[in-house]
Structures are given as structure tokens and as C-alpha cells.
Amino acid sequence: MQHLLSFVFLNLAGLCFSAAPPPTSAPIFSKPFVVIWNAPIYRCNQLQVPLDLDVFHAITTPQRVPNQVLTLMYYNRLGIFPYTDLYNFTQYNGGIPQKGNLNASLQKAQKEFDYYIPSSVPGLAVLDWEEWFPLFDRNADLREIYKALSINYTLQENPFLSSKEATLRAREDFEKAARRFMEETLKLGLSQRPNFLWGFYLFPDCYNYDFLNPNYTGKCPKSANVLNDKLQWLWERSTAFFPSAYMPVSVSKTQKAALFVRHKVLEAMRVAHLSQRPYSAPIYLYLQLLLRDQNGLYKDEVDLIRSIGESAALGAAGCVLWGSSYYFNDKESCKSLSAYLSNTLNKYVVNVTTAAELCSDLLCQGKGRCVRKNYDSDDYLHLNITNFKIQKIDGMFKVFGKPSITDLRAWAYTFTCQCYEDSKCRAQFGNI
């Protein structure tokens, strides 16, 4: 991608803001906001359906492919975590964290990390563990089995405990063991590949799924905030956060979509600031191209703005566009994807990533990331189509134009800067 941009000398007196958010870690990809592809495309390649993926910072797959910029470690590539099948109740590796073999798990994880992440270049390591949650009370519905098994195990070991005492002991033992598995696995990864950013997929979650509420605000329930506060140890160990905001069709094209994504990102930012580090860990939001549980129904530009655009405006470091091989497994679905990339997605990705980079360079002196002053506004980092043109030339998207003084004023009034670690920046325009 080529940016043919020229800039003007601008001195906007008075547009200097002091109320900036705490600093964040410097971007490992040298861009304030990136969009990463994380979906298998081998079937489309086999079917000789061309896919234009050049606009993405990295093209990765969730499959068993080593040496990727983003490595997604599913449960079967993540040591030997104990778990129980939620449908037939078969117990594996002990079934519950208390009965697991942590040393054996770490030995296997070390080999897997060595294989999948052989390089020392910077990247993202996403640990995808969804069988149980580390907080006892978060294991609801089908995951209630972990509570029952834990209580039974406690009573086997301590038969004279009352039911209440056994439940309290089971909660304590479960959470202690779950923490050890997750925390020690993170520590191992960080020690082996310190240039990678490590974190668990889905964490933190906002639990803002009450879409049927006519007064839906998107805000996390207070109970979610309280429980997330109990995972302080996880926020301290994580060097990146990977929350998920897969958009259901019921909120598509509505303001609820923006509110849903907004508070997912804001909760991740909140817990990031709980860490004792002098700067917050970056946030990479997991999204899907398709609306959740819909095969072939893609997000339109409005939904892209309220997902990718929302996360960029709030100060996320990037988005990961995840997809399953099930989505793109025949010629028709591959052609549909190809058309969607060419006609809708790619131009928007170029727009928002270019705008984020321009705002960072011009408002934050390239030393910080532009973030909304008012998180609950609908201000976005977009190029003004009056002054910019995005064209595809020789198969590559190119951006032509320059921001007007009006454009820059608009950014300055609606955005401030989150400086990178060990950098000094101020939300102001000076000599450009």
C-alpha cells in the first residue's frame, strides 16, 4: 500500500489537551492500529479463487502452522490441561484443575511453544482455553459439571465436611489450581518468547449479552466488573488482551452493535490499567467477518464501522478477523468472500488504518495512539472522502490526498493521545 500524502504547516493555538489516558506499551508492529487476518484460505487457493488480502498487516491461520505472526494455541496445543467433556462427561487429564499434572502440562507446552513459535521476532501468542473458567462461579450452565466434580472430589478427600464447607473448599481449591495452570503457562511462554505478546482469548469478558433489553446500554453488569477484579493475577501476567466481540445478527445495523463492541473494549482497557506495570497492555479485539452463527451473511460497512472502527477509535492496538474453515469450504463461499473483500472490507480497512496512522503522526507526533475524548461518542477515525481518494491501482490500494485544516481540527476536538511507554507526546498540532 502506498500513501501519497502531502501536509501543510499548521499551528492550531489552544488545541493542546492535558487529560490524556495513562501510557500504553509501544506497538510491536510499528503501526498504531492493525487488522490481522486469522482464517484458513487453503481451500480457496485449491479452488483457484483469488483473495485480495494485501491490506492486512498479517495473513495468518488458526490451523497447525508454525512460525506465524499470530499463533493461536487451541486446547490440544496447550500442554495437558485437565477438562471434562461437557456432553458425555468423559474426564481428561484428571477432569478438573485440582487433579491435573501441571509439570507434565508445562513440559508438553514447552515443546509446543518451541514448535509453533520458533522465531524470536515480535508477534502475538493467543492461548485459547475455553473448557473451564478460572473463577468457580463463572462456570455456569453446561460448565456446572466442574462445580459438581470439584465438590465431590473435596468430599472424597474430606468426608466429614458439611455441604457448605465442601463447596467453599472446592471453590478455593479449584480457583487455586486453575490459576496455577493458566499463570504458569503464561510465565513459560513469556520466558521462552519474550518478544511475543501473550494472553488468553476471551479475557476479559464484559458479559454484555442482554440484547433483548429495550434499554440496552452495552455496559458490563457490575457483577462482571467485580469478578474481573478477582483476576488481577491474570491481568498482571498478560502482556496483551484478546477479548472477543462476535456480533449476532440481532444487533446488526443497530446502535446496539456499537455499544456491544464499545464496552467490550472499555472493560479490557479498565482491567489493563489495574496492572502494576507503568503502562497498560495493548488490546487486540477478536472479530468475525460474518455475523455470528450465520453462514454467508457478511457485515456491511455500518457493521464494520461499529466493530473495527469502534475499536480503533477507542484506542485498541488492532483487530483480529477470525474465521473457520467451515465458512470458506467450496467455490461458492470462496467467490462470495473474494467479492466481499474487493467490494467492501478492504477499502474500509485501508480507510481506518490510514486514518489511525495519520492521527497518530499528526496529533500525537507519532509517539502515541489517538483515542476518543468522549468514549461514548460516535466519533471515528476515518478519512474525509472529500479530501481523500482510495483507489486500486495495479492490484494495490493507494491513498491519495491530504487532510484539510478542518479535518485536523475535527480530530483535535474529538480525540486525544495515549502516549506509548517511555515516550512523551501531547495532543496538539505543531509544525508538520
Where are these predicted regions, by residue range?
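Substrate-binding cleft of secreted/luminal carbohydrate-active enzymes
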Residues: 23-48, 68-76, 238-239, 245-248, ...
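Aromatic-lined carbohydrate-recognition surfaces of secreted/lumenal glycan-active proteins
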Residues: 36, 166-227, 261, 276-292
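N-terminal carbohydrate-binding/catalytic regions of secreted carbohydrate-active enzymes
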Residues: 43-115
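Alpha-helical scaffolding within the catalytic cores
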Residues: 56-59, 109-111, 220-232, 263-272, ...
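Conserved N-terminal segment of EGF-like repeats
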Residues: 298-302, 327-432
